[in-house]
Amino acid sequence: MTSSAGQRISCNVVETRLNDVARIFNIQRYSLNDGEGIRTVVFFKGCPHLCPWCANPESISGKIQTVRREAKCLHCAKCLRDADECPSGAFERIGRDISLDALEREVMKDDIFFRTSGGGVTLSGGEVLMQAEFATRFLQRLRLWGVSCAIETAGDAPASKLLPLAKLCDEVLFDLKIMDATQARDVVKMNLPRVLENLRLLVSEGVNVIPRLPLIPGFTLSRENMQQALDVLIPLNIRQIHLLPFHQYGEPKYRLLGKTWSMKDVAAPSSADVATMREMAERAGFQVTVGG
């Protein structure tokens, strides 16, 4: 959806699909880590950022991608004519377009779980703000059903896209990816000043914001990064934060996409390192959840 690193600094993206059609890559049911209760999580495809630690590389491109699972391949060569003719299912498409009506029907299959657990629907990504108009219309529909709504976002978009969507949510899981402005700009391709401005705006508008801080060796797993985040959050009277330790669960996805992951040999944070970050936040008065 973007053509150069310079353009990838923000979510100033022209929505390329009709507003009643979205591009997603997964619907995950029975999630317990993306908001209150049992959640159905809709993962939108496309992200303007380039986080080296991304665990969902299939979410980055806004295009529908086709991958081949070598273990399933029969080497019959039928795919040379048409990948859809593959008899073994070795070819897999990542991403699909779905209408408002179809997505509404899909998530409402889980309504009984929402009502019995206090759960609901969470929109994640990729970056949901790249398809903000669709997402806003979709949550408006869910609100008519009385469904609890949440989004997970990095907040790097014009407030005109973020605020109407956030106001439909019971929770906004706000990813504070990195607090160093230079790394945010040059590595992650993120507009950190705007992210922080949007964070403050949401809080001032009464939105229930839950910041999420990734703990990434070499980037954010440091006292300095944590203190910078706390310095931003303390004046906002936010009481709850999530700490998300780095993991290697995404490594097979990079291989499937034919990509080399720069962090494939990076170890997860030690329990002692995570405890240090947690203690800093708790001493500052925050209720801390590790893992979301």
Q: Across the structure, where does each feature detected by a protein language model lie?
A:
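Conserved AdoMet/S-adenosylmethionine-binding subsite of the radical SAM
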Residues: 101-104, 108-256
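Short, charged low-complexity linear segments at domain edges
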Residues: 18-38, 46-67
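Cysteine-centered iron-sulfur cluster-binding motifs in ferredoxin-type domains/subunits
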Residues: 41-54, 66-89, 95, 127
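Active-site anion-handling motifs in enzyme catalytic cores
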Residues: 98
